[in-house]
């Protein structure tokens, strides 16, 4: 089917979202809550675009709106830029030290600091809760309603069944989730509060704690499956690299036999 994207005719596959079609054609639509590996949730609203179908214009979120027929999409009109400017200003009040929001502020001419800082340290994109569910941790979830919505653990208690994989921290667009390894435990910190605490497995070679017990146990359970290569999960990455390098060196030098140097031979 044919789509008019910012005045240019492009071909699109039915069922593809506006965001997918835009990116395939080199059009940049800003997002904070979208990751291709997760189902779109349209939480941040930065990807709002203007859609014209059957002579009717309306605003839709590009990340989760599938195209079903010929249409026109406008991604960068003055009205859209004004809306994104306001969204960035509001989100910046929640995370005033976020570099991502500062960059978006420059892009859309936002008046950062227009709204009082409330330092919530969260833009409510929901990515951490969604990826936690996806990997099977089910530790984090969106709790509350309306302006009181927040990311939290069950009953606000420190979770002990967390995998400790760190996916929540890596996916956070404003880098507000902290992973701390102290002693034999890993702690996940959200809103400055301890969300989970997980024991770390010590390396059998050097004794250094290197990975969450629960996360490594799941990997070891799957190590016999065809799609998962077998690794020695009882030693840390540093010892594993050192052992691998030693084996490679021994294998390489076994090919050469060093002849003893005879006295009187020409050097």
Task: For the regions a language model picked out, list residue spans one by one.
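Cysteine-rich micro-motifs
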Residues: 226-243
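Extended interaction regions within the primary functional domain
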Residues: 77, 225-226, 239, 261
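Long, low-complexity intrinsically disordered regions enriched in Ser/Thr, Asp/Glu, Pro/Gly
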Residues: 254-258
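Ferredoxin-type iron-sulfur electron-transfer modules and their immediate structural context
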Residues: 1-161, 165, 169-171, 175-187, ...
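Extended, charged low-complexity segments
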Residues: 242, 249, 265-267
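Intrinsically disordered, low-complexity coil segments
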Residues: 184, 260-261
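Acidic/histidine-enriched, beta-strand-rich ligand/metal-binding domains
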Residues: 214, 218-230, 262-265
């Amino acid at each position: 089917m044919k789509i008019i994207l910012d005045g240019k005719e492009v071909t699109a596959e039915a069922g593809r979202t506006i965001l997918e079609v835009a990116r395939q054609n080199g059009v940049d639509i800003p997002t904070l809550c979208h990751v291709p590996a997760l189902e779109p949730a349209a939480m941040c609203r930065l990807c709002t675009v203007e859609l014209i179908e059957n002579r009717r214009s309306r605003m839709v979120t590009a990340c989760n709106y599938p195209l079903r027929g010929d249409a026109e999409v406008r991604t960068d009109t003055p009205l859209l830029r004004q809306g994104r400017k306001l969204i960035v200003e509001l989100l910046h009040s929640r995370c005033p030290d976020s570099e991502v929001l500062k960059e978006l502020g420059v892009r859309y001419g936002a008046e950062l600091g227009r709204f009082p800082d409330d330092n919530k340290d969260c833009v409510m994109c929901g990515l951490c809760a969604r990826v936690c569910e996806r990997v099977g941790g089910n530790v984090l979830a969106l709790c509350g309603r309306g302006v009181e919505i927040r990311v939290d653990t069950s009953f606000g208690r420190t979770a002990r069944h967390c995998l400790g994989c760190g996916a929540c921290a890596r996916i956070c667009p404003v880098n507000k989730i902290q992973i701390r390894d102290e002693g034999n435990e890993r702690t996940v910190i959200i809103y400055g509060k301890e969300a989970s605490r997980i024991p770390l497995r010590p390396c059998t070679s050097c004794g250094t704690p290197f990975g969450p017990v629960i996360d490594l146990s799941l990997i070891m359970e799957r190590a016999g499956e065809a799609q998962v290569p077998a690794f020695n999960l009882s030693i840390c990455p540093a010892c594993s690299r050192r052992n691998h390098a030693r084996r490679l060196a021994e294998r390489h030098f076994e090919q050469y036999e060093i002849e003893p140097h005879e006295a009187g031979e020409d050097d």
